[in-house]
Amino acid sequence: EVRVLDSLEEPVHRGGVKPAYLDERIDFRRGDVRDEATMLAALDGVDAVYHLAAFQDYLPEFSRFFSVNVTSTALIYELIVREKLPVRKVIVASSQAALGEGLYRDADGRAVLPGLRRDEDLKRGVWEIQPGPGQAGPLAYQPTDETVANPQNCYGMSKIAEERAALNLGRMYGIPSVAMRYSIVQGPRQS
């Protein structure tokens, strides 16, 4: 048995309409993952949670990134613990954006965690990350341990916070929890 809670918001869901491809046997509920009563009803009788809800955009709605992506995750754990729900596992959808650009080494072998790419470089068509002050170029990308996180936008910051909330709350309360770092999940049926 599968239950889905979704707000059906634009632009992911054009017209706010439930996708026609959903199997009719799915227990579909429309609602906001940040609403306690809605979330509690959605969790009733559930033994595994796949928390895929996320706000992603480049608009300066900074607080919305955290309320949807982090607060809703914390709410799931809060309800599981407070209501003693029989949830056996929680899986949250994170993102490659939680890592930022990853780890580089400069020409002198020093580790570099770069910040945002410079607008002036991008306007000139320079896509490679450039050395910063005190760094010898060129920079060479290094395989990056997943514990190295340096997110560069609100979405990435909220996803690393979501990961930490899920993994730490899961550990604290004995709820097996996993954060999956997806990469560019877009296109038809992305939701």
Per-range role (PLM):
Residues 1-183:
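N-terminal Rossmann-like NAD(P)+-binding domain of SDR-like oxidoreductases, especially those catalyzing
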Residues 188-191:
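Substrate-binding strand-loop-helix patch
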